[in-house]
């Protein structure tokens, strides 16, 4: 019997959280529909000991895959390769799913035909486990459970990685793989499938629970400064993807990809601005922006961030003030040069 959903669990130094993550999938009425790939990304025997308990108890649900360390992108790539379920979702080994929303998702997937299923997600506190807030995908006239042509609604919404469940066949068609040995590949996972996405549906209950408050998270500004080159790599590959795909995409999909890449461009500028002001960071912003304006004008024009727009209008003369404001917002100290 074909599994309805493959879940790829990225497991790297998450021994403290992995059991909670795996337990969250074990809803009796739906677990038989699941293929759960626990992908140990070179993290050692601690992960294996936990995973093997679940493989032994539920051999038709869980599968342990050991691989050399390659980063989050490599676990997603491997998960897509190994997946046999009708649909595919990726879950970090320190996050979880919400029971009622997850059961609703599985019930829908049994009969689903859409390329992309979107569910809202929530954030919870690492210390207390309490639900903090729900991240919703809103647009005018949105109807839950209605199948939309992606092109008809994509100007009104931008879909986060944690909200996505893709048709597996679609992901296997992708010409590009996610970057390996690299942080910040979420945007690649969001955008690389877009040429193949024709239909989308939104479901009402939140499914994915994102753990908030881990000091080592890659979105922490200190981590972003440390891994600035990773972010630059992802931006470059997204620009390459856009350059290749823009000639074949519909206008609506093209605008969607432009907005997505523009978000990463803005994030790159924020990283540069978060360092202590110096000529090298100002030069990087100016050079990057000039190149994008020349080679990828659609992405350049898709930038919506008011601070970046103001910086451009000033001819980058406001760089010192912009850097000061950014550093204040992120509570940066004098380190990280």
Annotate each PLM feature.
Residues 14-27:
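Short, well-formed alpha-helical segments that are part of the catalytic scaffolds
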Residues 19, 45-54, 100:
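Acidic helix N-cap motif at the loop->helix transition within catalytic regions
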Residues 33-42, 63-68:
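Short beta-strand/loop segment that forms part of the nucleotide-sugar
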Residues 40-49, 71:
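A conserved acidic beta->alpha catalytic loop
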Residues 67-83:
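Glycine-rich, basic loop-to-helix element that forms the pyrophosphate-binding segment
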Residues 72, 76, 93-201, 208-225:
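Donor-binding/catalytic cores of nucleotide-activated saccharide
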Residues 88:
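Short aromatic/hydrophobic "clamp" motif used to bind/position activated sugar donors
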Residues 114, 273-337:
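Membrane-interface aromatic/basic loop that binds lipid-linked glycans or pyrophosphate carriers
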């Amino acid at each position: 019997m074909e599994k309805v959903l493959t879940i790829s669990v990225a497991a790297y130094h998450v021994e403290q959280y992995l059991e909670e993550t795996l337990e969250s999938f074990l809803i009796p009425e739906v677990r038989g529909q699941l293929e759960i790939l626990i992908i140990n990304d070179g993290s050692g025997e601690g992960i294996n000991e936990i995973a093997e308990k679940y493989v032994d108890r539920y051999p038709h649900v869980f599968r342990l895959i050991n691989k050399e360390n390659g980063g989050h992108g490599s676990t997603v790539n491997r998960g897509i390769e190994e997946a046999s379920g009708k649909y595919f979702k990726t879950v970090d080994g320190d996050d979880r799913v919400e029971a009622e929303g997850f059961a609703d998702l599985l019930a829908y997937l049994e009969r689903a035909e859409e390329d992309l299923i979107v569910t809202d997600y929530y954030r919870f506190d690492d210390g207390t486990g309490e639900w903090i807030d729900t991240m919703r995908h809103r647009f005018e006239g949105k109807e839950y459970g209605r199948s939309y042509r992606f092109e008809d609604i994509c100007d009104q919404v931008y879909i986060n990685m944690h909200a996505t469940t893709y048709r597996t066949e679609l992901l296997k068609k992708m010409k590009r793989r996610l970057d390996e040995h690299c942080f910040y590949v979420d945007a690649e996972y969001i955008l690389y499938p877009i040429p193949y996405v024709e239909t989308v549906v939104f479901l009402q209950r939140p499914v994915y629970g994102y753990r908030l408050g881990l000091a080592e998270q890659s979105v922490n500004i200190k981590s972003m400064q440390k891994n600035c080159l990773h972010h630059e790599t992802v931006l470059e590959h997204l620009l390459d993807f856009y350059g290749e795909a823009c000639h074949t995409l519909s206008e609506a999909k093209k605008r969607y990809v432009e907005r997505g890449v523009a978000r990463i461009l803005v994030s790159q500028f924020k990283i540069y601005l978060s360092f202590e002001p110096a000529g090298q960071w100002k030069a990087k912003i100016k050079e990057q922006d000039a190149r994008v304006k020349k080679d990828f004008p659609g992405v350049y024009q898709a930038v919506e961030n008011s601070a970046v727009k103001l910086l451009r209008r000033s001819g980058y003369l406001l760089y010192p003030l912009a850097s000061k404001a950014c550093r204040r917002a992120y509570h940066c100290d004098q380190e990280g040069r």
